Structure formats: C-alpha cells, structure tokens
C-alpha cells in the first residue's frame, strides 16, 4: 500500500470521467447477495453520454454529477406508499426515510432497477421500495465488515455525496476520494495517488463511472447507491436509493456507517446530523 490509513482526498475539479472501453464482467463470487446483472443490453459501464442512446432507459440532465436536485423534491409526504409490507422491520422508522426523500427516484427507470421500484407516482416519479433500501444497507454492512478498514474506498463526485462519503470513511476507517476521480488511481502504479483497495463504494455509477471502470479493471467488487435511472451491470451490490438528494445521501451513509461498525462489534456513536452536508 502507498497511502496512509483513513485518508481523505478531495479533488475540486468536477469534470465527468467518461467510460468508453468495452465492458468487463465483474466476479461476484465474493458476496452471496451480489447483484451483477447479465442482461446483454446493459453490458457497458454507465455514463451520461452512453445513456442518451440506451434502449432500456431515457436519461436526462439530472444524471450530471453537478446537477443536484433541490431539497423540495424530498417533501414530507410521511404517509406515502413506499413498500409492499407496511409492517416491515426497518433500521429507522419509515417516516425518517420519507422525510429524507430516500424513496424518491427519477422520472426514468432502467430494466436493471425495475425490481427495486415499488410504484410510479402521479407526477411521473418512480418510488423506490424503502424496505429493499433498508435490507441492502444491512447486506452492504455485512459485506464491508469482512474487509480491513484501510482496504475500503468510498467515492463521490456528486456535490451532496462528498461530505457524507468522507464522514463515512472517517467513521469506519476507510479511504475517500471525492470530487473528480483521477484516472489511474486504481490502475497506474506510477501515479502519486495510486492505491490498492479491496472494495469500492460509489455514490452514483454514472458520476463515479471512472472509479467503477477501474474497479472492474483490477477485479475488485463495487457497492453502488443506485437510483431508478441507473444501470447496474458493473455493480456487485446495489443499494437502491435517491442518490442525488442531500438528506437522502446523508441518511444512507449514516446508516451504512453505523451498521458496519455494529457488525465489527464497535460502538456506533454517530448522529445523523453529523453526516448532513450543508446547502
């Protein structure tokens, strides 16, 4: 390893990295509940430019890593139908998921994400199944708890994902790369910032496409927070969530940190407001 433990690096240049090479299959044998998809129509690493012509989805400007939604999309509709089993045992009350807008998808969906969508609202927004979000956070925590903290990498190019991603890294002892992901970070040993993690957590497979591409190249698993418009063919474990909203990302990273610490037998002393990015 060439880096210090628990390192956090932020690159302020927000230019998107675009994946143009041929797709590479990811070995999912490391996790029983891994989500590598086999649909031939979704075999390329998702990028904003690729998505425009994809036959399985219609994607728009809300996929840009710089285009963050306003928090009014996360309105307090606390009685909204967001999961098939209203009595499901969740990590936090369903009202807390709703108030953060974790369930709010986009007006586009992919065939990959269809199984995580509970319904479509009258305004055309797809509603994610919160019970699956909750379940996948637990699964991801179980998975991450098997790794040495300094061998975990979390990335986020999205504005509202950067702070909670860094806070997650600080909480669990992982490394963080936020802002623009420098090409060669995982693949070029001559690059000064080169690292060799064993697992990568990404905030959005579109905005973090370069990190996903390099993880595939070196053969390490990818855990991704995926919205209704994401493709997941290069992802090993999907956490379905609103991956654009400020409060939604704070809640998911907070829960993931606390659950990972819990599975290590460590104390979870972090409060939600410690993970919330400023507006």
UniProtKB/Swiss-Prot annotation:
CDD domains per the UniProt record, alphabetical: RPS2 (cd01425)
Superkingdom of the organism of origin: Archaea
UniProt-annotated stretches for the region Disordered: 1-81
Signal peptide range in chain numbering: none
Record key words, sorted: Ribonucleoprotein, Ribosomal protein
SUPFAM superfamilies for the chain: Ribosomal protein S2 (SSF52313)
Annotated S-S bridges: none
GO cellular component: small ribosomal subunit
GO MF term set: structural constituent of ribosome
UniProt similarity note: Belongs to the universal ribosomal protein uS2 family.
HAMAP family: Ribosomal_uS2_A (MF_00291_A)
PANTHER family: 40S RIBOSOMAL PROTEIN SA (PTHR11489)
Record's protein name: Small ribosomal subunit protein uS2
Species the sequence originates in: Haloquadratum walsbyi (strain DSM 16790 / HBSQ001)
